[in-house]
């Protein structure tokens, strides 16, 4: 039973993406190039937004793959507070971690692009979920938080009852009756969020929901 967004957040329903998994891409460096070479790193986000992580210019001290990789990782991390991306480097592999808020978006296409001027060389692997890359997993809590915040935006003085239930063997939506009884009959409008990962909506679901409401 919530009287505000703050109540929901106190119950753990936040929009901090704590339950998400960040996507991870990798770049395996095969040649460290020469002093003055440039490496520009860009990532395409939803709606075609291109985030430029910056252009690193190699220096004399980048005299091996290991040294160059460490320098680029440090360069990326210096801008994390601005762009939200971070990097680690080991041996010849630079791992780029995407912001959790992007969810599953980086899992398809080629969001990471690296443009080189000079003789630095490497191979990109997008977040495929193999070979030390990681596919992103979207936050469910952020979705719940959004719907709750929209409820209170439209009705600041409203009272919202929220219930989470395990996956049933049969979708009869008895949970609706449970919610109404818990509220002592005060619920006047109800919404059902069905996790599509477990079960896709069918016309039979609508019939079952109507049965619960009608009785």
Identify the residue ranges that each predicted region occupies.
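Polar low-complexity, Ser/Thr/Gly/Ala/Asp/Asn-rich disordered segments used for subunit assembly
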Residues: 2-50, 55-215
């Amino acid at each position: 039973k919530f009287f505000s967004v703050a109540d929901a957040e106190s119950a753990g329903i936040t929009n901090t993406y704590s339950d998400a998994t960040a996507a991870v891409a990798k770049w395996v460096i095969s040649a460290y190039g020469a002093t003055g070479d440039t490496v520009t790193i860009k990532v395409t986000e939803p709606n075609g937004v291109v985030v430029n992580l910056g252009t690193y210019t190699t220096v004399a001290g980048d005299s091996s793959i290991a040294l160059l990789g460490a320098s680029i990782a440090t360069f990326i991390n210096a801008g994390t507070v601005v762009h939200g991306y971070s990097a680690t480097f080991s041996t010849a592999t630079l791992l780029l971690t995407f912001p959790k808020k992007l969810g599953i978006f980086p899992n398809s296409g080629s969001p990471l692009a690296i443009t080189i001027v000079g003789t630095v060389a490497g191979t990109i692997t997008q977040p495929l979920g193999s070979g030390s890359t990681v596919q992103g997993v979207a936050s469910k809590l952020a979705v719940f938080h959004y719907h709750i915040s929209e409820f209170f935006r439209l009705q600041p003085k409203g009272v919202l009852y929220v219930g989470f239930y395990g996956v049933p063997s049969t979708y009869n939506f008895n949970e609706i009756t449970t919610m109404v009884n818990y509220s002592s009959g005060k619920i006047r409008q109800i919404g059902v969020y069905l996790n599509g990962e477990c079960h896709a909506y069918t016309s039979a679901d609508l019939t079952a929901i109507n049965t619960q409401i009608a009785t």
